[in-house]
Amino acid sequence: MKSIGICTRLFSALVLACSFAAEPVAAQGFPEQDGAAPTSVQAEQKQPEYSTSVESPLVVVDALVTDEDGNVLMGLKKGNFRVLDDGKPQIITDFATTDAPITIVILMEYSGIAYDYFAYKAASWGTEFLDHLEQQDWVALVTYDMKPTVRVDFTRSKPAVEQAMRSLSYPGFHEANMFDAIADTLDRLEQVKGKKSILLITTGVDTFSRTRLDEVFDKLKRSNVTIFCIGIAESEYLMADLRAGTSSIGYLQMKNQLQSFADLTGGFAWFPRFEGELPDMFRSVAGTLSNQYALSFSPTQESRDGKYHKLKVEVSGPDGLPLKVTDKKGKARKVVLYARQGYTAPMASATAND
């Protein structure tokens, strides 16, 4: 019972961390990079049965550079970076800090499994995440149990998220089909331009998804979406570690899955034990999205094979050696770089299907 109490307070804070002063706002549509309202998340997107050839496709890799303490390293230049495509160095054609509008989906588990983690108290932690986003950024809220439900379509008005949070009542289903929810969200984001991210707030439990785990990974490899995961059942993981049997293995597997989603896409995964850890986590998500470097390169003709390619981003100092940084006391600190681990290459040519 002690474990459940910890999780209850923790998930309560997570819910309210996305909430602040209520103001009814109608929110429709997914944003295009130019600021216009894009295709709605609520509409089914039918994919065309053909593809078009692209003369000079660009692969954009967002990279975050920090020290081992999580301090962001800014002021780096194009010459500090090297991008490897399947081990082969690429010419970085475009380089910039990422100041384009952010598009982020808050994808939150809302099932009978997680209901005990909710509470209805006023709190101000929403500012820890939403207030760090810029006015031009877009946020959507999607919850899931047996299936995903769009609570707030993409909006620039952050209070719409809080309004939707307050409307949540007792979940209608006990199931939590996480894989289906991730796959559905990725499908909806496919037609959205610009910088796209998912903030996944979940126990990590998947009950009866039709989508398999390997299919989720395949979709992630084909997308350019960064996933940030907050595993809300860490106290349960800790309790499982104290017990013998399959439960400990199951919890470890769920944690590893969330960590893998983040690692593959260049994001982070957190597993907070206490409520007090949450504000820093939400600030980290917002800070990451606003402090990345955008590195672009054009794949060679031979590389345009429609296959998955492994990416590696390296950062070096002016002398070409690994970048070295020190803290205020002059102590050497390790440099940590976050970037997606690969991309699916375009085809060199394409024709319409019959």
Language-model segments: which ranges?
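Scaffold/interface architecture of coatomer-like assemblies
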Residues: A26-D354
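Bacterial N-terminal signal peptides
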Residues: R9-E23
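Charged interaction patches that mediate protein-protein contacts
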Residues: M1, A13-A17, E236, A350
